[in-house]
């Protein structure tokens, strides 16, 4: 639904138990703050409804960093993909259900954009 309301691409993501990582590219002069506010508030509403809870889901406001180079993009992509492994939740990043790498492996492309084949060949050995 967010992509119908705002124009943006999600390049990678990982939803952890207390935070989320997203590589998000706003398109057509969209506001990153407005996109994130909408995504995080809708997520919190659905999360609270699903678990019959009330109140805050997120500890703090979101923070953002601009990715300035291709090498920084690769390292950020890998950092996000490996987050559940570093947290010792899973042994392999592809085993964690709530991340972009798992979605890519399963062919689920409704949330994030599929990276080009050359990029996948470059990063995949560093993930699995």
What are these regions (language model features)?
Residues 1-16, 26-128:
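Short Pro-Cys-Gly-centered "Cys-loop" motif that presents a nucleophilic cysteine in a tight turn
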Residues 19-21:
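Histidine-centered active-site/metal-ligand motif
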């Amino acid at each position: 639904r967010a992509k119908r309301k705002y124009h943006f691409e999600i390049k990678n993501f990982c939803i952890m138990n207390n935070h989320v990582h997203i590589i998000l590219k706003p398109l057509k002069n969209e506001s990153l703050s407005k996109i994130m506010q909408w995504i995080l508030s809708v997520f919190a509403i659905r999360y609270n409804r699903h678990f019959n809870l009330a109140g805050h889901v997120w500890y703090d406001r979101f923070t953002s960093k601009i990715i300035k180079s291709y090498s920084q993009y690769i390292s950020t992509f890998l950092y996000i993909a490996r987050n559940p492994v570093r947290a010792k939740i899973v042994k392999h990043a592809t085993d964690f259900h709530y991340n972009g790498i798992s979605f890519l492996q399963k062919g689920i492309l409704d949330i994030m954009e599929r990276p080009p084949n050359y990029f996948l060949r470059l990063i995949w050995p560093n993930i699995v």
